[in-house]
A protein has these predicted regions:
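A short, N-terminal "cap"/entry segment at the start of jelly-roll beta-barrel domains
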Residues: 7-54, 89
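Short, conserved beta-strand element in jelly-roll/cupin
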Residues: 61, 74-87
């Protein structure tokens, strides 16, 4: 099992040889997802970590006041809040999300993301 003083987040993704891993991720090196991208004033920055024809894992950095307009999720998805605070609008209801928290979308779920403060998140998206 896993035991920690402050809790743990465990995510497992099977990476096949046909998957494309971002070259910034080095085998055998420790890294923090939240530190892969900087914040940029007035902008949203994103970077694919790994993807294939069935899934995508992306890290995004939102400057305060930026956001994504409402759209339908192209597949099932999980958001991992990495830093700061954001607002996830899902099916007409707002949900505040902070670093260490997660949120799930169903395929087709209408959602938007707003950064009430600077906000970094990772997104695991199925593409089937």
């Amino acid at each position: 099992g896993i035991r920690t003083k402050d809790g743990v987040i465990y995510t497992e993704a099977m990476i096949r040889r046909t998957d494309i891993m971002n070259e910034m991720i080095k085998p055998g090196e420790v890294f923090k997802l939240a530190e892969l991208l900087p914040y940029s004033e007035g902008k949203i920055i994103n970077m694919d970590i790994v993807h294939n024809d069935k899934m995508k894992f992306v890290v995004m950095a939102f400057d305060e006041g930026t956001g994504l307009t409402e759209h339908a999720a192209p597949g099932e998805a999980i958001i991992f809040a990495l830093d700061g605070e954001g607002i996830i609008s899902y099916e007409g209801k707002d949900h505040v999300i902070k670093a260490g928290e997660n949120f799930c979308f169903a395929k087709g779920g209408m959602h938007a993301v707003k950064a009430s403060k600077r906000f970094k998140m990772a997104l695991l998206l199925t593409l089937e």
